[in-house]
């Protein structure tokens, strides 16, 4: 179906109610009307009650428990596959077409509203699929009411924020639309948005309201407020207006980039912009071509820093040495310079440690030394290898049952956390860390789950005998007080004593573990994956103290939701010392939009991050992020400063000089070139005199690298013995490994990632793990999101 066949629909409620979770469709495409299906993700993991479009890939890589509509390259529905039908498993995607796939009521309602031979168009810019039994009309006008202005976004509210330049301050669970001073929507999605100058933000939290905004409030639409009513419209005249608006926003981005002294090719950007003519836009297809070009230009404004950690979390699924080499080679090609390898998953260790009590051995470890193969493969590719180990999380719990912490109801929680107060467990986990540190030439160790489970206001943790005895010994408060805390929680007068006790206990365990590791391996960096929520009683995880005390070198906050990177990066950045570093955790597994992924990559650099870590490798590849990033923002290699210290410092000197030159070029002032032969302190002094923080950023990082350097410790004889299970020459060649060996195919693998940096595992395998029955899928995803978003 061609775009030229669009006919005018007029004013029509575009079946937003149809997409409300657990609602019922009251309009069908065969009625001749155009219905709109809001799309949550492109090529993402199909979580519960969401709609995903799969395109430009061979298959969906999902299980059979979704409701599927298959659309040909001509824009015609050619097949419908209900949830549970085996044909929907890893469904083929038509070349040039797409698959519309959903779960839960949202998916079922979409499926029932569509018929074979209906016309369908995916408007990716607006993140919606338009479907009709006749000609498709992309235009509309509708109105809805809001409940308040500049107020807290509670449940059952739809809020307008209109204080220019101020953030909305919302959490990561809603959906926001930004409107500029001309009344055009300039962005849709995310949270904690900055209110545009002279414009406003529409913010929703309820599922029905979020779907309302997704269906109607697409970028480029006109948005007008009258009283407590918002009217949104989109017509032919807005096609070219959309492009003009995007160009204006791009110009603002350019000015921002220059003010932040980003080292990008401004001349090349100007040349590409000059070739764009809004008058070339006359329908959705031509609009999308121009918009894609503008987005491509916008991404040129993201600086490719020469020194930056580009990390990825991954729990290995490979079954052979050859497959390991192939995986690491793929990471290198994607621009990854650091791998955080999870070596424990669901209570199983890929390393067979002698007399290991707290973990079972992964069955693959009897066939080859998985970790040693990763050590060798990463060394060959020049990738920094950080081993990530869950400290108190037990996974399936079989091996750590004697050490469990208990809830205030006396129960073992589903995540099987060990008690931080249990000395026997801590001795065992310390021995495990020590064995890894002294038997493998790793570059770093990362603490995962070094905390209590999340306190949700009702279920608290730490009521095992070891914890209660220690609390009484340290505070003098007896069993009656502990029983009272268990019942009253935050309302109890000694609640803060309880929280401080648990927090202090975690602090001590971090210090003890780091002291032991550093006594064995002074040459490696120690980091921690930490929760984004830092409320005192949420996790009892005081990472700012760990950094201040020097007990960890760096932290990786898991700030996975859309729209929260700026504030999260600034918050955790305030914890930094002159000898620590910050790598921001990105939720690739959450099926974030590609625009959001680029935005977060840029924001972590702008707001004080030293790099980014994607959770996790399988999702990063399957969702198309790797293929996109390696074409632009990660097309050039970067140095990890915790791996190549001296080289990083020299590169930062050069970057500082280039930024100094750009500063004078943009300000119109004249000045001397920066002498890169000066000491770092002298360079910093010269640059700081200009009062511009962007001028000093490179040397500030160089000074931190110099202060926390482990370089003088490198080359020491710290290993007890090298593993005898060296990779074969065939493994080293690596290139001929099969797809199945590399863990890249869709299988019914039972391997999954149990790490605090994310429990989603490899996204190729995850859909089958979640699958089984739809209800089980919803529960599983609920557990994952409940744990990760908090």
Place the predicted regions along the sequence by residue.
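C-terminal low-complexity, Ser/Thr- and acidic/Pro-rich disordered "stalk" regions positioned immediately N-terminal
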Residues: 718-763
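Polysaccharide-binding and catalytic clefts of secreted carbohydrate-active enzymes
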Residues: 410-545, 549
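Active-site-adjacent "subsite" loops/lids of carbohydrate-active enzymes
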Residues: 307-313, 319, 375, 385-440
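Substrate-binding cleft of secreted/luminal carbohydrate-active enzymes
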Residues: 551-569, 580-719
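Catalytic domains of carbohydrate-active enzymes, especially glycoside hydrolases
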Residues: 323-349, 439-443, 551-555, 607, ...
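C-terminal membrane-anchoring or membrane-association module
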Residues: 772, 776-790
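Sec-dependent signal peptide cleavage junction
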Residues: 20-32, 754-763, 783-787
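Aromatic-lined substrate-binding rim segments of carbohydrate-active enzymes
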Residues: 327, 345-393, 501-520
């Amino acid at each position: 179906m061609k775009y030229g066949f669009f006919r005018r629909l007029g004013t029509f409620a575009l079946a937003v109610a149809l997409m409300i979770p657990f609602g019922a469709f009251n309009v069908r495409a065969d009625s001749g009307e155009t219905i709109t299906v809001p799309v949550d993700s492109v090529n993402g993991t199909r979580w519960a009650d969401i709609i995903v479009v799969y395109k430009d890939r061979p298959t969906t890589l999902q299980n059979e428990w979704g409701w599927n509509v298959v659309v040909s390259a001509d824009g015609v529905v050619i097949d419908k596959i209900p949830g549970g039908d085996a044909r929907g498993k890893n469904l083929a995607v038509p070349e040039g077409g797409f698959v519309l796939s959903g779960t839960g009521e949202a998916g079922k309602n979409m499926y029932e509203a569509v018929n074979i031979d209906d016309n369908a168009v995916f408007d990716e810019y607006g993140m919606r699929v338009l479907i009709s039994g006749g000609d498709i009309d992309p235009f509309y006008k509708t109105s809805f009411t809001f409940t308040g202005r500049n107020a807290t976004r509670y449940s059952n509210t739809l809020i307008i924020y209109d204080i220019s330049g101020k953030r909305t301050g919302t959490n990561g669970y809603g959906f926001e639309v930004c409107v500029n001073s001309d009344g055009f929507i300039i962005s849709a999605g995310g949270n904690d948005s900055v209110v545009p100058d002279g414009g406003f933000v529409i913010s929703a939290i309820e599922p029905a309201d979020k779907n309302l905004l997704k269906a109607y409030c697409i970028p480029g639409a006109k948005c007008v407020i009258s009283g407590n009513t918002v009217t949104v419209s989109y017509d032919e005249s807005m096609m070219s207006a959309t492009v003009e608006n995007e160009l204006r926003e791009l110009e603002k981005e350019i000015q921002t980039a220059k003010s932040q002294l980003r080292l990008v090719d401004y001349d090349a950007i100007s040349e590409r912009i000059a070739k764009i003519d809004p008058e070339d836009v006359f329908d959705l297809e031509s609009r999308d071509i121009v918009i894609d070009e503008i987005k491509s230009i916008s991404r040129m404004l993201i600086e490719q820093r020469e020194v930056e950690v580009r990390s990825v979390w991954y729990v290995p699924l490979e079954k052979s040495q050859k497959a390991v080499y192939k995986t690491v080679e793929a990471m290198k090609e994607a621009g990854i310079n650091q791998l955080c390898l999870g070596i424990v998953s669901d209570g199983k260790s890929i390393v067979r440690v002698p007399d290991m009590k707290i973990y079972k051995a992964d069955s693959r470890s009897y066939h080859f030394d998985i970790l040693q193969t990763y050590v060798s493969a990463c060394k060959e590719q020049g990738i920094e290898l950080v081993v990530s180990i869950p400290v108190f999380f037990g996974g399936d719990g079989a091996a750590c049952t004697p050490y469990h912490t208990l809830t205030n109801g006396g129960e073992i929680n589903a995540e099987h956390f060990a008690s931080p107060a249990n000395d026997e467990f801590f001795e065992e986990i310390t021995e495990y860390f020590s064995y890894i540190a002294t038997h493998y030439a790793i570059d770093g160790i990362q603490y995962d789950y070094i905390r209590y489970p999340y306190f949700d206001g009702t279920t608290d943790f730490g009521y095992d005998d070891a914890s209660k005895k220690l609390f009484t010994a340290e505070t003098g408060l007896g069993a009656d007080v502990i029983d009272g805390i268990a019942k009253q929680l935050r309302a109890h007068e000694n609640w803060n004593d309880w929280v401080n006790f648990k927090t202090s206990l975690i602090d001590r365990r971090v210090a003890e573990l780091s002291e032991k590791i550093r006594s064995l391996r002074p040459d490696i960096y120690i980091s921690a994956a930490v929760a984004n929520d830092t409320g005192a009683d949420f996790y009892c995880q005081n990472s700012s103290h760990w950094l201040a005390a020097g007990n960890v070198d760096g932290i990786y906050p898991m700030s996975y939701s859309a729209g929260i990177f700026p504030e999260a990066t600034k918050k955790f950045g305030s914890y930094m010392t002159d000898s620590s570093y910050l790598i921001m955790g990105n939720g690739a597994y959450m099926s974030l939009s590609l625009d959001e992924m680029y935005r977060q990559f840029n924001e972590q650099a702008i707001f004080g991050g030293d790099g980014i870590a994607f959770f996790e490798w399988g999702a990063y590849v399957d969702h198309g992020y790797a293929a996109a990033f390696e074409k632009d923002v990660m097309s050039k290699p970067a140095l990890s400063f915790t791996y190549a210290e001296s080289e990083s410092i020299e590169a930062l000197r050069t970057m500082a000089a280039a930024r100094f030159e750009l500063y004078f070029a943009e300000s119109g002032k004249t000045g001397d070139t920066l002498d890169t032969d000066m000491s770092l302190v002298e360079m910093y002094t010269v640059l700081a005199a200009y009062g511009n923080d962007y001028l000093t950023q490179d040397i500030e990082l160089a000074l931190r690298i110099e202060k926390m350097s482990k370089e003088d410790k490198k080359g020491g004889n710290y290993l007890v013995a090298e593993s005898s299970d060296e990779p074969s020459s065939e493994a080293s060649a690596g290139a001929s490994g099969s797809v199945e060996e590399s863990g890249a195919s869709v299988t019914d693998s039972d391997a999954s990632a149990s790490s605090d940096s994310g429990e989603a595992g490899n996204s190729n395998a995850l859909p089958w793990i979640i699958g089984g029955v739809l209800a089980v899928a919803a529960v599983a995803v609920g557990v994952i999101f409940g744990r990760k978003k908090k």
